[in-house]
Amino acid sequence: MSFDQDSARYDERHRALALAFRRADLTFEQLWNRYFALGGNAGLIEVDAYLHGLTEFSALQHDILAHAINERLDETWPQRVPYSFPPRATGPHTGPLAGLVKLLDGMHQAPPELLPVVAARAGQALGLRITIYLVDYEQSMLHPLREPESPHLASLGVDSSVAGRAFRAVETVPSTTGQQPRLWVPLLDGVERLGVLDVVSPNGADLGDPELRLRCRWLSTLIGHLVTISTHYGDGADAVRLQRARTPAADLIWQLLPPLTAATGDFTVSGLLEPRYEVGGDAFDYALSPSTATLAIFDAVGHTLRSGFVAAAALAAHRSTRRAGHGLFEQARAMDETIAGQFSGGAFATGVLAELDLYSGRLRYVNAGHPEPLLMRSGKVVKRLTGGRRLPFGLGTGELTVAEEFLQPDDWLVLHTDGVTEARDHNGEFFGDERLRNFLEREAASAHPPPETARRLVKAILAHQNDVLQDDATVLLARWGKRNELTL
């Protein structure tokens, strides 16, 4: 650029600044105070002289002064003073970061129904076409979360489709539909399985590219988190996942449950309950920290809304005491007092409270009239945990003994309610302890992770009863000492 051109630009900026100052409705003192607060180092007299064209400023000092005026103009007038240097871009417009930013910005104050639209725009920033499929609460079908007025898409079976394979195994699976290559990417919130993403590249990008798959993983992680968050303030996602209305008792319990699966380092826990829409008194809970995993499972007497209230009270008493830093003794006592104090007529809940030291494998537990937990080691059910027996919660404290067991790396702990082993077929035959043991050992040989094992177990219990349960059936599976594989 020539000297004359440079001088002309300087004069233009100076004239614009002087004009803007007149419109800013500021005194020299007010302008200088703003300029000085932004880091300007010229004195009041120098600023006055510069505005009247009697002296010159460096480009940096001009821009600081211009910014002080622009801040005022933002309050009073739409025109702005031009800067010496072009302003930086306000955000990414292409690439993986642009896709993530579009998701975050797009879902800010957006209802759940807009999530497929926002996800599609995020995919476009990566040159991809993305469709969200959410798993239903039966974990049997994957249903599309469609954009408004988009073409109809068929639901896909968890046990009978490539998409279902990606969901079951928690791994990205490539496939080709017609001539169109695609990726099925597990949709996770943390390690909880929510569904899959259908990823297609309209531009013919190589879907085997590790960098592209990594970007899909980032999108999946954020979309999964947004699905969960949006469920707290809207029903759009649940409308897809719910295949029929829950009973009030079931809805109460579901709103109190933690995520169905969670993991920290080398510990994974996964729970599931059935029937999804009519569960009455079953519930489970857990809390994970770097050093400790706390587990709990409850079965309140009866199958009515009152049973749901008892289970909810037990869960709340357990959580509030645990969060206050108290141990198993205090947790059990709080549950006794809460149930006995709030419900008449002999209300109670059976249950197991357990606390695992994640450094040593030391397990401490209390069993309040509940089926005994099972310990699996090297793919075999090696023992029942028979200690720590006491009365059900709500029937009096009595004597309380905390039992101990030491786990070894890769051990599994299996907690369940009586609806699992007491499930009956049409001939009245129980599912039983032996069938449960055989099922767990077969699953261990298949190397399925805890959430898939829980899903298959509940499915087996339903099949044993011709899909009609006589009682709630809940399982809580925990594995310690093996790095979890529930990542993409």
At which residue positions do the language-model features occur?
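Catalytic core of PPM/PP2C metal-dependent serine/threonine phosphatase domains
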Residues: 126-128, 245, 249-258, 305-391, ...
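A short, aliphatic-rich beta-strand micro-motif
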Residues: 173-175, 180-189
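Regulatory cytosolic signal-relay segments
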Residues: 219-279
